[in-house]
Amino acid sequence: MSVPKKRMQLPREVVVGSNVLPEVPKLLRSVGVPDGVVAVFSGRTTMKIAGNEVADHLEEAGYQTSPVIVKGSTGDDVKKALEALDEIDADVVAAVGGGKVIDVAKVASYRRGIPFISVPTSASHDGIASPFASIRREGRPYSEPAQAPLAILADIEVIREAPERLIRAGVGDVVSNVTAVKDWRLAHRLRNEPYSEYASSLSLMAARIVMKNAKPIGKLLPEGIKKLVQALISGGVAMSIAGSSRPCSGSEHLFSHALDVIAERPALHGEQCGVGTIIMEYLHGGNWREIRETLETAGAPTTAEDLGVSDEEIIEALCRAHKIRPDRYTILGDKGLTREAAERAAEETGVIQ
């Protein structure tokens, strides 16, 4: 029996540590980019925090740089980024910022056939290393074809200075791997969906590392933040191995996306995924209390009140989550939850009162 061909994109170099921004030129040379024009993608705030410093280090090392300010992660933002790359004639992209900056950079660089390196300024989600990007079109997030970073440079001191809420959102995003893998296994068993034990094991290992280190992460200790960043990178690599977002995205992510559409003021993606994981682990018959305890220890939200959304919005999101991606089979099934089942799950887990 022949084996189908599979292509994986993985980062060639990963540097995680304190005060490592000066190593950007060395990192580029190590992955085969000794010179050329670097488009430095960043937000207005993150450009001041780290983008300008990255550009300075590159200029001192002989590279040419050109700043590209990314305001959001919509289709229009991608279009503007593509126009900027064409004007600059860039050889490589350095994405210095949070999730939106990195998502736009990985899509734009992919479409122009040039490499990009990821320089995260926060640890809020696993897009740091994944080959997928979430781009908003017509008010809704869509997964877009992109590429994994050629290299990653994560400065722990820069990430620690980000708003605490972003760190706690990262905890929620990693912990959600637990139910994502359970959903994937369920789809494999019931729908014969392709499944990778290697990718799922790596994803679960990342979740367990964060669960084990919830206390130092919650206290924003350097070693704790390092563990979180490594776990987020591992999740991204797991997705590259799987060739899909399955190892890190299941029913809890569908719940979060539904909440984005329904809620008047949605919370952060990772925060919502963490709360969604509590409920989905309950539906799977798993140890949802352990999930809740991990999030509480790390200072992450565990209730509707913590998220700043209403009980009704939680229930409505649970009822509509299965419609977000009908092709992605999860514990929610084809028909989703009844209102009664959604209300019971949210109440039993303490997400709503």
Curated annotation (Swiss-Prot):
NAD(+) binds at G99, K100, V101, I102, D103, T121, S122, A123, S124, S130. NCBIfam families: PRK00843.1. Pathway: Membrane lipid metabolism; glycerophospholipid metabolism. Keywords: Cytoplasm, Lipid biosynthesis, Lipid metabolism, Metal-binding, NAD, NADP, Oxidoreductase, Phospholipid biosynthesis, Phospholipid metabolism, Zinc. It is an enzyme of class 1 (oxidoreductase). It is found in: Cytoplasm. Its main location: cytoplasm. It catalyses: sn-glycerol 1-phosphate + NAD(+) = dihydroxyacetone phosphate + NADH + H(+); sn-glycerol 1-phosphate + NADP(+) = dihydroxyacetone phosphate + NADPH + H(+). SUPFAM superfamilies: Dehydroquinate synthase-like. This is Glycerol-1-phosphate dehydrogenase [NAD(P)+]. The lineage of its organism: Archaea, Methanobacteriati, Methanobacteriota, Methanomada group, Methanopyri. Catalyzes the NAD(P)H-dependent reduction of dihydroxyacetonephosphate (DHAP or glycerone phosphate) to glycerol 1-phosphate (G1P). The G1P thus generated is used as the glycerophosphate backbone of phospholipids in the cellular membranes of Archaea. One of its GO terms (molecular function) is glycerol-1-phosphate dehydrogenase (NAD+) activity. Substrate binds at D126, D173, H257.
